C-alpha cells in the first residue's frame, strides 16, 4: 500500500544518509548527495524530512533508542550486574557491527563541538547512561564492582570504550577483507574476538 511504499522510501533515504554522513562527516554532507545515493528526488526527501539536521537527528534517535530498549530489557532480566553489563556491552557491539555507518556517525556526534542535539536525543543519551550507571551501582551493592569507582564516569567510559573498540575491530575486518579474506568470516571472527574481550573486561577490570 501507500504507507508501506512511503516507509520504504523513508528507509531508503535514511540508509543513504547513514552511508554519506559516515563517509563524509555531517558538515560535508549535503541533501543533494543523500538523494543522489538514495535514488530519489529532492522533493521526495523534503516530503519526509525538513532538513539535513532532521535526517541526522532521526538516525541517531532511532539508533540510540534501539540500544536503550535493549539495555532496559537486559537490565530487567539479568540475575547479576556483571551478567547485565556483559550482555549490554555485547549487544551494543553487535549493533555497531551490524551498522558500522551508524557507529561512525554516533562516535563523531557524541563528541562533536557545537553539536545541536534535539531534546529527544539528549533524553536518550541520559537514559542510556542512567541504565548503565544503575547496573554499575548494582554491581557495587553486590560486591562485584569496587565501591570507590565513580559510577557516572564509568558509564560514560564504557560507552566510549565499546564504541571506539568496536569500530577498530570493524576496520581490521575491512582491511582483512580488502586483502582477500572472506568478508563474512572476517567480520564474524572480529565480532567473536571482541565478545570474548568484553566478557573478560567486565569480569576483571573492576576486581
Predicted regions and their residues:
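Helix-turn-helix
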Residues: 12, 16, 20-54, 58
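Short helix-capping/turn signature of helix-turn-helix
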Residues: 49, 108-113
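Hydrophobic alpha-helical connector segments
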Residues: 58, 72-101, 151-158
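Short, basic, alpha-helical segments at the C-terminal edge of helix-turn-helix-like DNA-binding modules
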Residues: 61-68
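All-alpha amphipathic helical-bundle segments outside canonical DNA-binding/catalytic cores
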Residues: 83-86, 119-124, 141-159, 189, ...
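Short, solvent-exposed amphipathic helices
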Residues: 91, 102, 116-127
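C-terminal peripheral helix-coil segments that are non-catalytic and often amphipathic
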Residues: 91-94, 98, 126, 130, ...
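Short, hydrophobic secondary-structure boundary micro-motifs
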Residues: 104-106, 148, 178
Amino acid at each position: 500500500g501507500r504507507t508501506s511504499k512511503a516507509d520504504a522510501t523513508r528507509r531508503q533515504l535514511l540508509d543513504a544518509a547513514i552511508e554519506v554522513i559516515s563517509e563524509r562527516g555531517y558538515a560535508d554532507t549535503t541533501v543533494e548527495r543523500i538523494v543522489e545515493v538514495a535514488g530519489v528526488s529532492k522533493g521526495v526527501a523534503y516530503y519526509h524530512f525538513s532538513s539535513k539536521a532532521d535526517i541526522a537527528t532521526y538516525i541517531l534517535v532511532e539508533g540510540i533508542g534501539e540500544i536503550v530498549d535493549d539495555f532496559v530489557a537486559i537490565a530487567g532480566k539479568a540475575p547479576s550486574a556483571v551478567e547485565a553489563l556483559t550482555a549490554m556491552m555485547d549487544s551494543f557491539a553487535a549493533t555497531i557491527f551490524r551498522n558500522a555507518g551508524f557507529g561512525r556517525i554516533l562516535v563523531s556526534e557524541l563528541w562533536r563541538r557545537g553539536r545541536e542535539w534535539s531534546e529527544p536525543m539528549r533524553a536518550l543519551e541520559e537514559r542510556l547512561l542512567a541504565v548503565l550507571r544503575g547496573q554499575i551501582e548494582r554491581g557495587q551493592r553486590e560486591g562485584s564492582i569496587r565501591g570507590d569507582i565513580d559510577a557516572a564516569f564509568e558509564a560514560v567510559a564504557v560507552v566510549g570504550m565499546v564504541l571506539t573498540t568496536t569500530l577498530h575491530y570493524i576496520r581490521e575486518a575491512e582491511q582483512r577483507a580488502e586483502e582477500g579474506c572472506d568478508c563474512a568470516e572476517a567480520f564474524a571472527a572480529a565480532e567473536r574476538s571482541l565478545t570474548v574481550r568484553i566478557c573478560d573486561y567486565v569480569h576483571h577490570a573492576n576486581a
